[in-house]
């Protein structure tokens, strides 16, 4: 069973006398006992037919509110419901019987035993073996801000100094603009519930992707990889060498592509996709050693072909990362 309309009415009676003062910052609450319903409040079988004794006086509001919260959190369904919501947000929006039994149930017990401490239950979920299971990787589409911020972190895009307020504002403006273009205008949700992608069944996260937003998501990464955002003499742009040099053997095409895709993508690629990426480094099927020689010259300032090799290799790396981030797998987290 579930709570009833009568339960809602009784809860409203518990809250009589309370008001909000919007003139304070932050808002404050006030209890006026003369406006409080002092009669008993009777709840349904869902709450064990609990009766909250009516109180009077200046402490009546706190006393009855505490009694109601104790009653509400004494019902197992409260912890189960909240854990399902956490699971939908952080793991996946479909909860089958197996997940309900093996994950949600035990998680709800942890939640109750912790005194309903969100930090404890989140730590348990996010450190669980289930959370890192391969089946749960790449199953949620990134929201636009996660895609943007994730890209900047992955590519270690350098931002202006924290004291340069004008440039920083222009950088945030870029993010805000692309957020609006991809249907996440921060600070201006469509309604009080927020954005449907985080709550609306059955679409949930799939709402982020459509024929209009997908090209614009790709345009964001393309722009910062290939062109950069110029404000005066400052350019915000991803340097492909920063990430590339962190790999174990970037001079070997197969190693570079394998480690780059493992780092940037949640799912493994097909042989055909890997071949397509390799074609960027070795156009026309030329031997692997061509990239190895090019990479060596590009990273050795004393090499007589350094400048030419650096320009060519940089262009190839930019196109490689562009291609990886244009894959559908990059839209997943």
Residue ranges, per PLM feature:
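Alpha-helical scaffold segments in carbohydrate-active enzymes
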Residues: 10-21, 113, 117-120, 124-127, ...
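Flexible, low-complexity segments enriched for small/polar residues
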Residues: 75, 79, 83-114, 123-333
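Non-catalytic, conformational "gating/processing" segments within enzyme and secreted inhibitor domains
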Residues: 1-97
């Amino acid at each position: 069973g579930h709570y009833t309309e009568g339960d809602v009415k009784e809860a409203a009676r518990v809250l009589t006398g309370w008001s909000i003062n919007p003139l304070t910052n932050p808002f404050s609450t006030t209890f006026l006992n003369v406006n409080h319903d002092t009669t008993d409040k009777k709840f349904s079988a869902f709450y064990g037919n609990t009766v909250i004794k009516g109180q009077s006086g200046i402490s009546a509001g706190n006393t009855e509110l505490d009694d109601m919260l104790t009653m509400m959190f004494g019902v197992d369904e409260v912890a189960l419901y909240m854990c399902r919501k956490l699971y939908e947000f952080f793991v996946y929006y479909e909860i089958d019987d197996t997940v309900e039994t093996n994950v949600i149930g035990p998680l709800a017990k942890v939640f109750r035993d912790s005194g309903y401490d969100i930090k404890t239950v989140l730590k348990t979920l996010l450190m669980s073996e289930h959370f890192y299971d391969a089946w749960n990787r790449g199953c949620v589409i990134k929201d636009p801000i996660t895609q943007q911020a994730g890209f900047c972190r992955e590519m270690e895009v350098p931002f202006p100094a924290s004291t340069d307020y004008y440039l920083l504002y222009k950088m945030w403006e870029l993010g805000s603009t692309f957020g609006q273009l991809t249907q996440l205008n921060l600070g201006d949700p469509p309604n009080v519930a927020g954005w449907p992608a985080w709550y609306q069944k059955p679409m949930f996260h799939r709402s982020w992707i459509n024929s209009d937003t997908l090209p614009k998501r790709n345009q964001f990464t393309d722009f910062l990889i290939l062109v950069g955002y110029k404000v005066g003499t400052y350019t915000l742009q991803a340097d492909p060498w920063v990430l590339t040099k962190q790999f174990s053997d970037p001079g070997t095409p197969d190693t570079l592509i394998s480690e780059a895709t493992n780092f940037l993508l949640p799912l493994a690629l097909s042989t055909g996709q890997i071949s397509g990426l390799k074609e960027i480094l070795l156009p026309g099927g030329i031997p692997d050693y061509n990239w190895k020689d090019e990479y060596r010259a590009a990273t050795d300032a004393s090499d007589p072909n350094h400048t030419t090799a650096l320009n060519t290799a940089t262009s190839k790396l930019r196109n490689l990362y562009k291609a990886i981030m244009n894959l559908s797998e990059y839209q997943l987290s």
